[in-house]
């Protein structure tokens, strides 16, 4: 029977040695050889009739090696289960640790050494201390409602053809061709097309376009028509290029001009924006806009609070990790072998995510946070009904068949399950912190420091 010893070689980092006498693995090797001889196919021999000596000579060394490794791995697995060791990933064979020569004709006592990374035990101090967090309530200002009215009037407006570019509400349809040093078009077929509101163009382009008619052609140089704060965006879209073409000449053809005629604020617009709400007055429309903007702000605020809790737990929960083992596992223990430089570059984000996995797993288990298959199905059904604009009382004969099809999609089920599980985890966490409510304006909210930067101290 194998002898197993364990010694600490670092923080949460142990070396486990499996020592085997030949009697531990030779019977398994002989059994494997007999089984292989029954199935191996060699030209000139019937299946199962290949001489044992030939099979051993041809395939014995590889089967011998496999059986020794298999036996050692099985002994190690049994030991880990018996000792109830919680380890990261899987054991890694120690480099340059072999002290034997594998020879099937001369079996010897052998030993293998593995290194393992142990999962830490830890307390979640931010929860124990009822750490303080802020939940922000973003106010929907009257100016926001006014801006939203203008945006919707323009969005649902119509474009009327015009002869000449004359104001900021004009819609510009244009094509761009790159030119060579002489000003000639490089490739007539290589063009970029763009449709944009006049007032969204760089100021220099606006000056050139004013008064132009459809089919007019002129040339521009991006860094001459763009300010420093406009250049990068203009090169990216519409020109689909980079800073290397900042001084390149482009031929611009104004293919069409149209005028954006904003929609009137009336019942037809209200019905298009909110088809399921019977809105007849401007005041009611404004109230509905305020309600919808409020919902979006609640979502954004909740998302920030979730990020705050996540970052606080990751950065303020003290837990040790077997860094040396984890880096070696990242380098050698996966399908993709990484360089030392790649490991160092990726370790920060890996460490961050691993800490969250340990913390969230502990919280989910200890607080019995669960999601069952019916929960997943009901959530997906609600999403389907929302997508089709259905109410709870609406009948849909096709729904059962549609849901059966969705419930066979393992990826969708897994994604929904994980989202619901973590939603419930964060709902629970909201009850475990000291949360203060604070009203802020939209501008104040978006000036707040990023949660990661706030809590990142290690």
What are these regions (language model features)?
Residues 87-99, 149-169, 409:
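Phosphate-interacting basic helix/loop segments used at nucleotide- and nucleic-acid interfaces
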Residues 2-71, 78-79, 178, 211, ...:
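Extended, charged alpha-helical "arm"/coiled-coil substrate-binding scaffolds
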Residues 64, 70-122:
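Extended, domain-scale alpha-helical bundle/helix-rich regions
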Residues 117-157:
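Internal alpha/beta scaffold segment
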Residues 110, 172, 218-220, 248:
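Generic structural signal for buried aliphatic residues
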Residues 32, 149, 160-212, 221-222, ...:
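Core FKBP-type peptidyl-prolyl cis-trans isomerase
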């Amino acid at each position: 029977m194998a002898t197993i010893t364990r010694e600490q070689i670092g923080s949460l980092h142990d070396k486990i040695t499996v020592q085997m006498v030949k009697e531990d693995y030779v019977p398994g090797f002989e059994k494997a050889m007999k089984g292989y001889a029954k199935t191996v196919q060699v030209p000139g021999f019937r299946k199962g009739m290949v001489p044992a000596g030939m099979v051993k000579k041809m395939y014995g060394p590889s089967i011998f090696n496999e059986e020794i490794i298999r036996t050692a791995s099985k002994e190690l697995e049994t030991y880990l289960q018996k000792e109830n060791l919680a380890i990261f990933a899987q054991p890694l064979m120690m480099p340059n640790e072999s002290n034997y020569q594998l020879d099937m004709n001369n079996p010897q006592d052998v030993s293998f050494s593995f290194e393992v990374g142990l999962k830490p035990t830890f307390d979640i101090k931010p929860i124990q201390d009822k750490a303080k967090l802020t939940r922000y309530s973003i106010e929907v200002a009257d100016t926001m409602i006014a801006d939203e009215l203008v945006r919707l009037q323009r969005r649902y407006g119509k474009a009327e053809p015009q002869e000449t570019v004359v104001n900021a509400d004009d819609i510009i349809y244009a094509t761009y061709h790159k030119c060579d040093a002489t000003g000639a078009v490089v490739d007539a077929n290589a063009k970029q097309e763009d449709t944009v509101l006049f007032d969204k163009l760089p100021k220099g382009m606006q000056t050139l376009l004013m008064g132009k008619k459809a089919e007019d052609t002129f040339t521009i140089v991006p860094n001459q028509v763009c300010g420093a704060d406009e250049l990068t965006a203009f090169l990216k879209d519409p020109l689909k290029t980079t800073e290397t073409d900042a001084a390149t000449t482009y031929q611009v053809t104004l293919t069409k001009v149209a005028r954006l005629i904003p929609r009137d604020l009336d019942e037809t617009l209200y019905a298009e924006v909110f088809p399921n709400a019977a809105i007849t007055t401007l005041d009611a429309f404004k109230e509905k806009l305020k309600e919808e903007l409020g919902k979006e702000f609640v979502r954004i605020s909740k998302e920030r609070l979730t990020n705050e809790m996540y970052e606080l737990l990751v950065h303020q929960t003290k837990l040790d990790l077997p860094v040396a083992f984890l880096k070696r596992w990242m380098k050698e223990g996966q399908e993709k072998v990484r360089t030392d430089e790649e490991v160092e570059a990726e370790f920060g984000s890996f460490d961050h995510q691993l800490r969250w996995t340990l913390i969230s797993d502990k919280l989910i288990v200890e607080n019995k946070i669960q999601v069952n298959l019916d929960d997943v199905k009901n959530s997906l059904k609600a999403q389907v009904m929302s997508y089709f604009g259905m109410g709870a009382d609406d009948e849909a004969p096709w729904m059962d068949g549609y849901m059966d099809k969705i419930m066979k999609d393992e990826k969708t089920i897994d994604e929904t399950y994980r989202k619901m599980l973590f939603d419930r985890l964060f709902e629970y966490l909201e009850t475990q912190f000291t949360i203060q409510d604070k009203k802020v304006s939209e501008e104040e909210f978006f000036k707040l420091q990023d949660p990661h930067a706030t809590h990142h101290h290690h």
